[in-house]
Regions:
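ABC-family P-loop ATPase nucleotide-binding domain
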Residues: 1-39, 273
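C-terminal boundary and immediately downstream tail of ABC-type ATPase nucleotide-binding domains
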Residues: 2-4, 8, 248, 252-273
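ABC family nucleotide-binding domain
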Residues: 28-253
Length: 273
């Protein structure tokens, strides 16, 4: 089936993938997403501590780290689900504190897939996928249906189009969530631990879809502990702890030659099982 979206002029053009260890930023080329000295507090708890990061179009970035290290907070600040307290975040040159302009750049450029699937239970799969394009983009309903059919085919569940979320497995629901985000034609996809709520036998079907998406050139920022996925698709792997970026590098160096003690300890624990 032909992609019903207009051609993406830049989203599928991989940027140079930078490497760095222990540093707080990973530049290289023009950054589509830029964070500078970002802090985030929840009361007295500092969830993000002076985080700087650049992500170029086409890059695939994996963020890992122990529970409470700030991974999900970082990705939620990028999508404006949390508001950072200090520093600056911009997407495509637009600062996220810029009111209506920030909302527009997020709506037009950023898709997000959560740990929980967040599908509307009272809507069919077709309705879940077409609601955003029709309501937010003003797309013709028939065109929106074509989008839904195309992306359900891409995530390998076209036969589920008329079902409701409760009739699908967890893995199928997460694939619907991915298809729903893609229907909005984002330039970057954010994934917040997309497999952590799934039964083990369903994890691979979601990871397979994510790998195929990465192979199309989609810009991806993934919070995950699936290290096999990171080794396979990431341009850069970032390790966070205590709200800081402790280390970042290309996968081969990150996994085979980690520089920081905290990174070494984390990898020894997570790769031992």
């Amino acid at each position: 089936m032909r992609d019903p979206h207009p051609a993406r002029s830049s989203a599928n053009s991989p940027a140079n993938s930078p490497a760095g260890t222990g540093g707080m930023s990973g530049g290289g080329g023009t950054a589509f997403i830029s964070l500078r000295n970002v802090d985030k507090y929840f009361g007295d708890f500092q969830a993000l501590d002076d985080v700087s990061l650049d992500i170029g179009l086409g890059q695939k970035i994996v963020i890992c780290g122990p529970s409470g290290s700030g991974k999900s907070t970082l990705i939620r600040c990028i999508n404006r689900l949390e508001t950072h307290d200090q520093g600056a975040i911009s997407i495509d040159g637009v600062a996220l504190d810029d009111g209506a302009a920030a909302r527009a750049v997020l709506r037009n450029n950023v898709g997000m897939v959560f740990q929980q699937f967040n599908l509307f239970p009272h809507l069919s799969i077709l309705e879940n996928l077409t609601l955003g394009p029709v309501r937010a983009r003003g797309l013709d309903p028939q065109k929106a249906r074509e989008l839904a059919e195309y992306y359900l085919e891409r995530v390998k569940i076209p036969e589920q189009i008329d079902k409701y979320p409760h009739q699908l497995s967890g893995g199928q629901q997460q694939r619907v969530a991915i298809a729903r985000s893609l229907c909005m034609n984002p330039k970057i996809m954010l994934f917040d631990e997309p497999t952590s709520a799934l039964d083990p036998e369903m994890i691979s079907e979601v990871l397979d879809v994510m790998v195929e998406l990465a192979e199309t050139g989609m810009t991806m920022l993934c919070v995950t502990h699936e290290m096999g996925f990171a080794k396979r698709v990431a341009d850069r792997v970032i390790f966070m702890d205590f709200g800081e970026i402790v280390e970042q590098n290309v996968p081969e160096e990150f996994f085979n030659n980690p520089k920081q003690d905290r990174t070494q300890l984390f990898l020894s624990q997570i790769l031992a099982h």
